[in-house]
Amino acid sequence: MGIMVGLPSPSGSEKDLQLNFGKNMTVQVEMRAPHLPAEWDLQSGIQLTWPHAGTDWAYMLKEVQECFVNIAREIAKRELLLIVTPEPEEVKKQIVATVNMDNVRFLRCETNDTWARDHGAITMIDTGNPSLLDFTFNGWGLKFASELDNLITGQAVKAGALKGQYIDCLDFVLEGGSIESDGMGTLLTTTECLLSPHRNGKLNQVEIEEYLKSTFHLQKVLWLDHGYLAGDDTDSHIDTLARFCSTDTIAYVKCDNTEDEHYEELHAMEEQLKTFRTLAGEPYRLLALPMADKVEEDGERLPATYANFLIMNDAILYPTYQQPDNDRKAGEVLQQAFPKHQVIGIDCRALIKQHGSLHCVTMQYPSGVIQ
């Protein structure tokens, strides 16, 4: 089955690219000026950076690899999957029985850790052509080793694992989990993370906003000043707190328990979200995700969150924590946000032991990047 491409007549300053994947599936791709896609825009595939014995997962390697296999299986049912690992042959043994190997690609590469969301390339699209922006990843503000992970994007482009124009942005520290795009020129982020002194400490908020607007061709940056999760290493990444689900919808973590340590900050975050406006000047439709019950490891509270879901072409993968009521409620909210998607829960209790979850270990790439 081939891919047939037809270009209709341009309309205004934009035109559409029609992709026909056989007789039953047609996708319209907007040929727009440079923009930062939304996560729900058409994807070619997802990156996972696989855990191995040289990572912080060594003490629970089998448990976390089982979680990665479950994520890989759901991805490869639907899209291409790029697995970054120093040991492709070993990973193949782990996944071959249950994962659609026709959709799996490997990049042999040394790695420090597994958080592809933060060391993966951030992709811009210009009239249908992808550009792969390679920012510095410095271990969330110099907290953890990152020298190998910081090289992955450059190696992936050089090896042809990622297709697109490589753009060196290594003079700026930025993690994918710290920004949310609506695909139309609005960015959602947190002051706690982007103003961290150990990231781009020489720049103030105005300068950082100007950099973001210039780099990503934005019209507006929405800064959340409130919201955090105990045990979080990222300085309040936005993908743990509030997520765009469409250009006018945001799903966010809501805490109803006044005795919970998060109550005041998450309530303040909710109130600030109510003040935000779309580019059309309208308030956002806000969908409240439940606050996960306390998850602890060795007496330490872990940053379990339902906001850390992954949007795919026809499915939503979201983390569950063996909390039946909360897991169910979160799935129902996400189904409301994405009525045409299949919503699939994946047990992420293993991931949260290293202070991350499902979205943190994945990075999606728009059409054409993974082939």
Predicted feature descriptions by range:
Residues 11-15, 282:
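Serine/proline-rich low-complexity intrinsically disordered segments, especially terminal tails, linkers
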Residues 21-371:
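The feature marks the mature, well-folded catalytic cores of soluble enzymes
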